[in-house]
């Protein structure tokens, strides 16, 4: 069997707020947007810079709906060049750090819809450092 990863779908309540998080804070880029008036929903496909294939599909239903807590979804993971600089940038933009990069290798942040985003340091872990080393999980 030949499998190829396509994308992860994340259902969102507020498309503008989610795009602000995924694009402005995380740095993903919109590679396609499709509005479906007859179905009353919008799909937005996002990719990390330098990737041509969508990795995240944001699905926004136009009619109000109650979405689950998000933790049962699991998470989406991205590799970053500098875990500390990335977390500092996200924190400055108001993003919640669920698990700080105490080990210099891994952190989790939360999207507006309570989806966990894992950030992994590229290559070897960085030397553990403050303020991350003593920061508790959220």
What is each of the regions a protein language model found here?
Residues 53-55, 116:
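Short, mixed charged/polar active-site loops
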Residues 2, 9-53:
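Core segments of cupin and vicinal oxygen chelate
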């Amino acid at each position: 069997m030949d499998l190829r990863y396509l994308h992860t779908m994340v259902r969102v309540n507020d498309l503008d707020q989610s795009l602000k998080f995924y694009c402005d804070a995380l740095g993903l880029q919109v590679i396609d947007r499709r509005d479906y008036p007859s179905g009353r929903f919008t799909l937005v496909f996002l990719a990390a810079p330098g990737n041509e294939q969508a990795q995240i599909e944001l699905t926004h239903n136009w009619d109000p709906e109650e979405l689950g807590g998000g933790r049962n979804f699991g998470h989406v993971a991205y590799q970053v060049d500098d875990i500390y600089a990335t977390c500092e940038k996200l924190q400055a933009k108001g993003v919640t750090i669920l698990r700080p990069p105490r080990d210099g290798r891994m952190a989790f942040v939360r999207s507006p819809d309570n989806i966990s985003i894992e950030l992994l340091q590229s290559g070897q872990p960085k030397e553990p450092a403050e303020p991350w080393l003593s920061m508790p999980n959220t």
